[in-house]
Amino acid sequence: MVFFVSDEVKPKKGGPRMIVTGYSSGMVECRWHDGYSIKREAFREDELQPGDGQHQRDRA
């Protein structure tokens, strides 16, 4: 699945809802707030699924 910058995603194995902030070296860069600070991590696309609040776009 292709994600766009500002899409909401979450890890398939469970975890926080995150926002896609970009792509680097074939990885999806994400950020989220854990209640104390902003966290960031890069994931493979196949590790992510759409979040509950994912933006609806015309992906044609």
Regions found by a protein language model. Name each.
Residues 53-60:
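Long, low-complexity intrinsically disordered regions
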Residues 5-47, 59:
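Basic/aromatic-rich interaction segments and small domains that mediate binding to polyanionic partners
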